[in-house]
């Protein structure tokens, strides 16, 4: 009984995380135009490092541990607009071709089975 409840809880937690991720992507319009994706990435780049620093300071205060100061991350310019939409297009293209490819492969497999059974 406990194993079933635990597996159900794991499923619900994973589903909640996945649903939250899908909602966040939809809410932030990350699958839309590239400029919005680029703006979201820049916004995350500005917000995450200070938040991580504040969290590490909080952990130091609460636990008494001394976390060594890490060097600042290098500033790297990566034009995400060039690769983000290319990745999305590749995935969507593969998904749109999948049914016809599955039909072709199953037809080839059926022909192979028919040839072997004769």
Curated annotation (Swiss-Prot):
The chain crosses the membrane at residues 8-26. InterPro entries: Mic13. One of its GO terms (cellular component) is mitochondrion. GO terms for biological process: cristae formation; inner mitochondrial membrane organization. It is found in: Mitochondrion inner membrane. The keyword Transmembrane helix applies. Keywords: Membrane, Mitochondrion, Mitochondrion inner membrane, Primary mitochondrial disease, Transmembrane, Transmembrane helix. Residues 1-7 are mitochondrial matrix. Its main location: mitochondrion. It is a single-pass membrane protein. The keyword Transmembrane helix applies. Residues 27-118 are mitochondrial intermembrane. Pfam families: QIL1. Belongs to the MICOS complex subunit Mic13 family. It is linked to Combined oxidative phosphorylation deficiency 37: An autosomal recessive disorder due to mitochondrial dysfunction and characterized by hypotonia, failure to thrive, progressive neurodegeneration with neurologic deterioration after the first months of life, global developmental delay, as well as liver dysfunction. Some patients may have hypertrophic cardiomyopathy, loss of vision and hearing, and/or seizures. Death in first months or years of life is observed in most patients. PANTHER family: MICOS COMPLEX SUBUNIT MIC13 (PTHR31816:SF3). Component of the MICOS complex, a large protein complex of the mitochondrial inner membrane that plays crucial roles in the maintenance of crista junctions, inner membrane architecture, and formation of contact sites to the outer membrane. Constituent of mature MICOS complex, it is required for the formation of cristae junction (CJ) and maintenance of cristae morphology. Required for the incorporation of MICOS10/MIC10 into the MICOS complex. Component of the mitochondrial contact site and cristae organizing system (MICOS) complex, composed of at least MICOS10/MIC10, CHCHD3/MIC19, CHCHD6/MIC25, APOO/MIC26, MICOS13/MIC13, APOOL/MIC27 and IMMT/MIC60. The MICOS complex associates with mitochondrial outer membrane proteins SAMM50, MTX1 and MTX2 (together described as components of the mitochondrial outer membrane sorting assembly machinery (SAM) complex) and DNAJC11, mitochondrial inner membrane protein TMEM11 and with HSPA9. This is MICOS complex subunit MIC13. It comes from Homo sapiens (Human). The lineage of its organism: Eukaryota, Metazoa, Chordata, Craniata, Vertebrata. The gene is MICOS13.
